[in-house]
Regions:
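Extreme N-terminus of proteins, especially the signal/transit-peptide cleavage junction
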Residues: 3, 41-48, 296-301
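Bacterial N-terminal signal peptides
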Residues: 12-21
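GH16 jelly-roll
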Residues: 26-286
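C-terminal outer-membrane/trafficking sorting elements
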Residues: 288-334
């Protein structure tokens, strides 16, 4: 550590006392480089604590915060991922929204694909197990449209063994949203329901949500239950949803004819995301959150860096945004 950082650590106890009124959610916001929840906004209930959110209120043209979000990786043979790009034209802030696009490729000599699409995820910065995810979004139905708000596991297991939680999908020009669960079980038991949908006009914003508990996944649109998927046994095949942490994915893709139809490659597809928020019940928040704000004590024996609420930061210390962290049993401020 540099001398400057050591001095900061020596002042930690005093600073923690001064910060003792800061909520855990605010601590997470500081560490994730996102702003506090707007005043007057409702939460799911007193049993939940806000542990992550992004309001996407940066100035117009700002790109997604790379300390929180990372661009999804392109996989040419995977439908949703075949056109993914880190181009600033497919993921940016505009009028208080994250805008995700699938656009005609303006330079096929540079990148030989028909379209470029936007997608971002949190696998390296934020993962969690159990809780409630809410995302306020607006989509624009059109032939070939295929936007999604979803989650994947942080696991070495191949798809679909680790599971997949699709909070929201919409296809083509349908006035309908879908909520779906994928696992090895759903693949091998095709006759068993693992998806629900709701017909509704898609010309306005909705809050899409999932409540993820130890034995059930419940999906909502504006508070109305759309679908529920229950645990049937303890197997990895049927219920992988208590075996791994999951991370968030937001993307605007296009179909290929297998579910969503083939796109009009000259059309610009667009999804607007106002905000995304994750809440957890106290029992599901990692126990490191219990470290007193006014006392430094041993809480980890490794050199890994954690947020106060327990999320491991998958980045070098030099890359951390400003905030309060725990490492080597001590809190420090960067």
């Amino acid at each position: 550590m540099s001398q400057k950082k050591n001095i900061k650590r020596m002042l930690t106890v005093l600073i923690m006392a001064l910060l003792s009124t800061i909520s855990f959610a605010q601590d997470v916001n500081l560490a994730n480089g996102v702003e506090p929840l707007p005043s007057g906004e409702q939460t799911p209930g007193s049993e939940y604590t806000l542990v992550f959110h992004d309001e996407f209120n940066e100035p117009n043209g700002t790109l997604p915060n790379t300390k929180v979000w990372r661009y999804c990786t392109r996989y040419p043979k995977v439908i949703w991922a075949r056109f993914l790009s880190s181009s600033p034209e497919v993921a940016y802030m505009q009028d208080g929204n994250l805008v995700l696009c699938a656009i005609p490729n303006p330079d096929k000599l540079k990148d030989n694909v028909e379209m470029l699409s936007g997608g971002i995820e949190t696998s390296q910065s934020f993962t969690f197990r159990f809780g409630r995810v809410e995302c306020r979004a607006l989509v624009n139905p059109f032939i070939g449209n295929f936007p999604a708000i979803w989650m994947m596991p942080k696991t070495t297991l191949g798809w679909p063994k680790g599971g997949e939680i699709d909070i929201f999908e919409q296809i083509d020009n349908e006035q309908r949203c879908y909520a779906t669960v994928h696992s090895a079980w759903t693949q091998s038991h095709g006759n068993e329901p693992h998806s629900g949908n709701l017909r509704m006009p898609m010309n306005r914003y909705y809050i899409y949500a999932v409540e993820w508990e130890e034995d059930v996944l419940t999906f909502f649109v504006d508070g109305k239950r759309v679908y529920q998927y229950k645990k049937q046994n303890d197997s990895q095949e049927q219920w992988p949803f208590d075996k791994s942490n999951f991370y968030l994915i937001l993307n605007q893709s296009v179909g290929n004819g297998s579910w969503a139809k083939k796109p009009d490659v000259n059309h610009t597809y667009e999804m607007l995301i106002d905000w995304i928020r994750v809440y957890q019940k106290q029992k599901h928040i990692p126990t490191v959150i219990s470290v007193p704000m006014t006392k430094i004590k041993e809480c980890t024996e490794s050199n890994d860096v954690y947020l106060l609420q327990g999320t491991k930061m998958e980045m070098k210390e030099s890359e951390l945004p400003k905030g309060i962290y725990v490492s080597n049993g001590k809190k420090f401020i960067k």
